């Protein structure tokens, strides 16, 4: 079955967005299509229908296709644990920890997983839209490449090269990338897509004509800068720019190994929430609600919290009646200690927690990966909210202790998380707690948002609307006849 690969001249050129747009455009025409990312490096991941995990951006592209995410869609996922090492996920399951040099040597073997997943997807769907990583012209990474042209050559598929004009220098990026790849790779580069253009397209046309004449490659189209586009971000942490007067102030520390910060996307969109992310050495502002996010290295990030003065700020926050919520790794930090006897998240050892819950977390092999459904308990909501939670668990830790007798949620017959006796502190292992409107409304009411009215955001509906907006741009701005020909449709 046809495969088309989208590569970029740089990181953040718009590959993820273009792939999502193409997937949605094809799916709306009734084409059976699936996304594919051979290798991804990200701490934001999603649980798959087959009990694995893949990068969050690929899960978004699956949604664009109308599919549940599957491990075959992202066969190699690298989750950084330090500047020089990462946890390697192969076809959804933890393979082990590797430093950069070891992984570079391992890539030839990882390619077997990549090709096996691609073949399985190709057998199940009519079209596969693949996404590269970074740039195909990184000279130091070209040996044993599995993320860009290495995969395209093995799969014998055409490539679209995306450049971001908003950053400037797009013609140099496109021409320079072609100059640095091999003759064979240039031959399979079908053409260009220019992304994030602002202004009158007539002013750009002389440059487009020159680009085609100079390279012999067509420009498939120019996508505009889409103001107000909000879709899942995999790498960057950013807050919304506007909120209503009297909004609930929510503060989140940007942990060095923060993971799954997409948990906060519904709060970014909520008009009644003023969401603030606080980074290293930044002042900690007053808040109504502090949320400790997920972490790929709980003990490391717990030490960072202490160095940055968060325990003292949290104690002051609670004395003045503020609320505190911990999610996954953030929940683990609220206990007496976090033990890692096998060094699953870094060095072997034990780190004292914030001691706000009578509980202990122990890191054990065998990551918990599962989608969950359930409801909030009356400990955190004014009354129990049944059927309001849909999310996922993704953690190594096993947590035990007296604090768990007051659970945060009930998940199909089993408890999750904890709530303090005074109701000020809560914790949960569930990612996606704000995704469903009823749960989001109840948690924000617990945190102090008095009047919500019709403010709650239907996050899933919003995501689909944004994907449809992207697909509309394919119809309006790209050469769809040329695309169909490339895809043999």
Swiss-Prot record:
Annotated pathway:
Cofactor biosynthesis; adenosylcobalamin biosynthesis
- CDD domains annotated for this entry? CobQ_N, GATase1_CobQ
Q: Name one Pfam family in it.
A: CbiA
Q: Which InterPro entries match?
A: Class_I_gatase-like, CobQ/CobB/MinD/ParA_Nub-bd_dom, CobQ_GATase1, CobQ_N, CobQ_synth, GATase_3, P-loop_NTPase
Active site: which residues?
328 (nucleophile), 431
**Annotated function:** Catalyzes amidations at positions B, D, E, and G on adenosylcobyrinic A,C-diamide. NH(2) groups are provided by glutamine, and one molecule of ATP is hydrogenolyzed for each amidation.
Tell me its family. Answer: Belongs to the CobB/CobQ family. CobQ subfamily.
> Which PANTHER family does this UniProt record tie to the protein?
COBYRIC ACID SYNTHASE, DETHIOBIOTIN SYNTHETASE
Q: What is this protein called?
A: Cobyric acid synthase
Kindly list the organism's lineage. Answer: Bacteria, Pseudomonadati, Pseudomonadota, Gammaproteobacteria, Pseudomonadales
């Amino acid at each position: 079955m046809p495969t088309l690969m989208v590569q970029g001249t740089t990181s953040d050129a718009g590959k993820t967005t273009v792939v999502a747009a193409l997937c949605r455009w094809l799916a709306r025409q009734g084409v059976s299509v699936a996304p594919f990312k051979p290798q991804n490096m990200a701490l934001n991941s999603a649980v798959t229908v087959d009990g694995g995990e893949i990068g969050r951006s690929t899960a978004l592209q699956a949604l664009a296709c109308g599919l549940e995410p599957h491990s075959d869609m992202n066969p190699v996922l690298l989750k950084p644990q330090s500047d020089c090492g990462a946890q390697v996920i192969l076809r959804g399951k933890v393979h082990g920890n590797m430093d950069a040099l070891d992984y570079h040597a391992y890539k030839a073997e990882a390619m077997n997983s990549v090709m096996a997943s691609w073949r399985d997807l190709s057998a199940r769907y009519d079209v596969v839209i693949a996404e590269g990583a970074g740039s195909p012209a990184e000279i130091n990474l070209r040996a044993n490449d599995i993320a860009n042209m290495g995969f395209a050559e093995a799969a014998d598929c055409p490539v679209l090269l995306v450049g971001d004009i908003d950053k400037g220098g797009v013609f140099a990026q496109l021409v320079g990338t072609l100059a640095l790849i091999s003759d064979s790779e240039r031959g399979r580069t079908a053409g260009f897509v220019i992304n994030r253009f602002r202004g009158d397209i007539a002013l750009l046309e002389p440059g487009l004509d020159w680009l085609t004449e100079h390279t012999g490659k067509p420009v498939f189209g120019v996508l505009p800068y889409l103001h107000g586009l909000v879709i899942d971000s995999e790498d960057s942490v950013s807050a919304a720019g506007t909120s209503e007067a009297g909004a609930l102030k929510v503060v989140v520390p940007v942990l060095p190994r923060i993971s799954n910060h997409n948990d906060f996307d519904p709060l970014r969109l909520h008009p009644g929430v003023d969401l603030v992310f606080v980074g290293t050495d930044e002042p900690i502002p007053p808040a109504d609600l502090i949320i400790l996010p997920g972490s790929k290295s709980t003990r490391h990030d717990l030490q960072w919290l202490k160095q940055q003065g968060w325990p003292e700020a949290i104690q002051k926050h609670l004395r003045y009646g503020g609320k505190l919520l911990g999610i996954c790794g953030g929940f683990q930090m609220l206990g007496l200690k976090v033990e890692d006897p096998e060094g699953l998240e870094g060095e072997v050892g034990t780190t004292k927690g914030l001691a706000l819950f009578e509980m202990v977390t122990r890191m054990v092999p065998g990551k918990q990966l599962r989608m969950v459904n359930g409801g909030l308990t009356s400990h955190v909501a004014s009354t129990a909210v049944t059927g309001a939670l849909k999310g996922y668990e993704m953690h190594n830790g096993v947590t035990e202790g007296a604090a768990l007798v007051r659970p945060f949620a009930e998940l199909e017959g089993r408890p999750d998380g904890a709530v303090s006796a005074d109701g000020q502190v809560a914790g949960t292992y569930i990612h996606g707690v704000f995704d469903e409107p009823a749960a989001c409304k109840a948690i924000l009411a617990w945190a102090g948002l008095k009047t919500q009215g019709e403010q709650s955001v239907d996050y899933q509906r919003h995501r689909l609307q944004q994907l449809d907006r992207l697909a509309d741009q394919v119809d309006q701005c790209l050469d769809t006849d040329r695309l169909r020909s490339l895809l043999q449709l």
